[in-house]
Amino acid sequence: MSIRIHPQEQIDAKSRSGALGPIAPLLLPNLQRLYSQRAERLRMLADGHPLTDYLCFAATLADAQQQALFDNPLTLDLAPVVANAAANGTPPLATQTFARTPHWQRLLLAIIAELRPQAPVHVLPVLEGLEKCAAGEREALASALLAGDYAAVGSDRALFLWAALSLYWAQMASQLPGRAQAEYGEQRHVCPVCGSMPVSSVVHIGGSNGLRYLHCSLCESEWHMVRVKCSNCEESRDLSYWSLESEQAAVKAESCGDCGSYLKILYQEKDSGVDAVADDLATLLLDAKMEEAGFARSSLNPFLFPGE
């Protein structure tokens, strides 16, 4: 099964025929406090953590995203985009085909301005370099980053470019009209909004109690994926669950013997404050254990890009 976003009128017609189920296949981002709450979570996790300094810096970057969001609102008419994507069976905000506007660069400059007074000394040259480079060069770097060409960008610049691009995509995703529905098809392992990889998955409480959603590493949307099924290849016969603590741990890794990949699962019932990005970043020791066991990560954390 795959998830597609359709114009509201198409969904209404199918709804009258009873085609929609009770499970929300897609949860678009609520940006009101997303980044400030992530910053709070990162600071809480940083207390006594071996990576205290980096987690605190990540929190500062999340705060900068929240302020840039407040200072740079975005309003777009995305109805034509959704209609075109529905007709072609593609994500409406697909990173490789969606025409970016200069807004994301304004977000980048706003984030840099927020960070500069409190950034570590070794980070300042990176921020200044991004600030001074030409708009066309920034666009080229963004295209390379979104295409997964991390070596062409460098992990130092990728962090800040992605922070701006992610905020831009999240602003658009939060405004998408229409609704999503599950359909037969492939590509369930990537975001139905933008086509990006997940960062981790979250088992919800509340209205979506017990349901697992994959959290997009770019646009912050979440899409439903049934539990006890590999999020990468959708096989279910050889899954194992790993944790650093006990079976009651709030963060586990689900490994698949069929494709050799793993993805972390965060359980809100164990800790209601878990954040898909923050808790993934704070459990890098679990990643190390999974790699030692021979599994490859099937996700991307926006605070941790591969080196050159």
UniProtKB/Swiss-Prot annotation:
The cellular location(s) given in this protein's UniProt record come to:
Cytoplasm
Q: Which GO terms describe its biological process?
A: protein maturation
One of the record's GO cellular component terms? cytosol
Keyword Cytoplasm annotated:
yes
Q: Which UniProt keywords apply?
A: Cytoplasm
* InterPro entries xref list: FdhE-like_sf, FdhE_C, FdhE_central, FdhE_N, Formate_DH_accessory
The record's listing under CDD domains reads: FdhE
Q: Which NCBIfam families match?
A: FdhE (TIGR01562), PRK03564.1 (NF002925)
Q: Which family does it belong to?
A: Belongs to the FdhE family.
- Protein role: Necessary for formate dehydrogenase activity.
**Name under which the protein is recorded:** Protein FdhE homolog
Q: Which organism is it from?
A: Edwardsiella ictaluri (strain 93-146)
